Regions:
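A short beta-sheet element
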Residues: 69-71, 78-131, 135, 143-144
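Positions in alpha-helical segments
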Residues: 12-15, 101-104, 115, 145-149, ...
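A structural connector/turn signal
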Residues: 67-68, 137, 149
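Alpha-helical coiled-coil heptad-repeat register
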Residues: 168-171, 175-178, 182, 189
């Protein structure tokens, strides 16, 4: 699949990003999606690391009971699993709830599309850099300082929405093909 190039590019100032379209901005994550620290007052829609599928951010139901305080999140927030960040557990919240355990919860500003930001954070380069900054050997964790300092490419909001919608559509098509292949494999057994 080939896509047309943008007419003009500029250096992003970030080695792993390379060039970006001329009209895009590059800003640190902490300025486009600040950290949420609001503690949950009641247990409502708890989400733990085990509820997030690696590399997709899909919410997985479990019967687990969760203890301890959580961070309140809203629809549109992003939950970044800070424990073992190489697992890429990054969830875009489609409803409000409580992040239980090792999460950095960030809230995109008004000029940032949360789905676009989630896709951007799920880039292999992004995850590898964050993973290289972890502390702790048995249970490596990503700090907010490292995550918040990450450069984030930002096209204008309408373009962010179009890119996120395109990626969501294409990912859904791939999911259908994978499910069909799994069904065919089961038939062959």
């Amino acid at each position: 699949m080939s896509f047309p190039r943008y007419p003009e590019y500029k250096p992003s100032g970030v080695e792993w990003l390379g060039e970006v379209p001329e009209h895009w901005e590059v800003n640190r994550l902490k300025y486009v999606a600040p950290l949420v620290t609001e503690r949950a007052e009641t247990r409502s829609n708890p989400v733990a690391l085990e509820n997030i599928e690696s590399w997709t951010g899909t919410l997985l139901p479990t019967d687990s009971q969760f203890e301890g305080e959580g961070t309140q999140f809203r629809t549109g927030d992003i939950l970044f699993g800070k424990l073992r960040p190489y697992l890429a557990k990054i969830h875009f919240a489609t409803r409000a709830g409580e992040a239980v355990g090792d999460f950095h919860v960030v809230r995109p500003t008004a000029d940032v599309d949360g789905r676009f930001l989630q896709h951007s954070m799920l880039r292999r380069e992004f995850i590898d850099i964050i993973d290289g900054t972890t502390f702790g050997s048995k249970m490596p964790r990503a700090s907010w300082e490292a995550l918040g300092a990450m450069p984030t490419p930002l096209p204008p909001l309408p373009e962010q929405r179009a890119i996120a919608a395109f990626l969501d559509r294409e990912t859904a098509k791939i999911d259908v093909l994978v499910a069909e292949q799994q069904r065919l494999i089961e038939l062959l057994k």
